[in-house]
Amino acid sequence: MATTSDDLRARRKAAAENCERWLSHPRVPVQDRLRQLTEVACEDSADVYGNDGDVAALEQEVADLLGKPAAVFMPTGIMAQQSVLRVYADRAGTDRVAVHGLSHLLVHELNALEEVHRLRIERMTSEPRQPRPDELAAIPGKLAAVTVELPLRDGGFVLPTWDELVVFAESCRERGVPLHLDGARLWESTPYLGHSLAEIAALASTVYVSFYKVLGGLSGAALAGPEDVIAEVRRWQRRLGGNLYTLFPYAVSAREGLRTVLPLMGDLYQRAVELSMALQSEGFRVFPEPPHTNSFRVYAPQAADTIETAAVQRMETTREAICGRWQPADVPGWSWIELVVAPHTLDWQVDEVAKAFGELLRH
């Protein structure tokens, strides 16, 4: 028997298909997306198993942006990070890696580090904040690598301050253990940290970046670091089935995101701060306050089913999609969503967004 939540999901899906305006990421028909890729493709020849074409050009662009000697394009970030951590473990002769308890590696990857690579996870903390040097120091013995996710998505998109990140990186160097940055949203982190991509990446041995989130690529990721490490990562990419015959559509879309969306990071961050203030004036709460990136959590003083019903009804009547599905918060009677400020968000006025959200509480 269908539940109220099931009915709301079905209604939301149907309403979304009829929407004509989106606050974050619009729905683009497949045919239109393919035409867009045709218009922006720069290379005449496709890559073959990652060699030449847009893939090779993208790898060089990423290496240059991050100030690293080499980079490799991969179909997924999961594969990229598993591969580099496996390389570090094999080199160090230990299977222990230090990870945040809320990191993507542990929350969303079905224990792949343990199940596939037999790595042992040492949790520095599971608090919704970045790990501290003393928490790393509390883990005894030899470590293969330390990972930091910038920002920590499941902690609320939280970042360290620049000084905190520098001190943490120094603690890794003093211990003689490689620091790996999970930079799935690193592009979005530069305004808050106040430093360039290369300056941030210089604090770590290797860095992973994603192309399909704010940059709007089809899919895919890149890993940047020393040439010898990247060469070994390429071998693991092959072993894990990620060295596809050609990946040029993904690389074309990634390069277009670097050209057109990356320059907007400052504007997106500023709009996130403005929206967080406006939403609070409508009775919502936000975390972190102010936001650290273009993404943050919005909390509503209503039960999830109540405000979700209002959100779906608004989608049905206005054909506007302003938020994702509301989820129950830890506090009874409250609910929350993630709000991502994307390029299309800049087409909305701040007071227009605040009014739209306010309607959900006054429904």
What kind of region is each of these model predictions?
Residues 7, 22-76, 90, 101-107, ...:
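Conserved N-terminal alpha-helix of the aminotransferase class I/II PLP-enzyme fold
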Residues 129-183, 188:
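Active-site phosphate-binding strand-loop segment of PLP-dependent enzymes
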Residues 87-145:
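PLP-dependent aminotransferase-like
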Residues 2, 283-363:
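Conserved C-terminal alpha-helix-loop-beta "cap" of PLP-dependent enzymes
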Residues 136, 190-198:
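Distinct, well-ordered alpha-helical segments
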Residues 120-121, 179-180, 286, 323:
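Hydrophobic beta-strand scaffold residues
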Residues 154, 159, 202-302:
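Active-site C-terminal subdomain of aminotransferase-like
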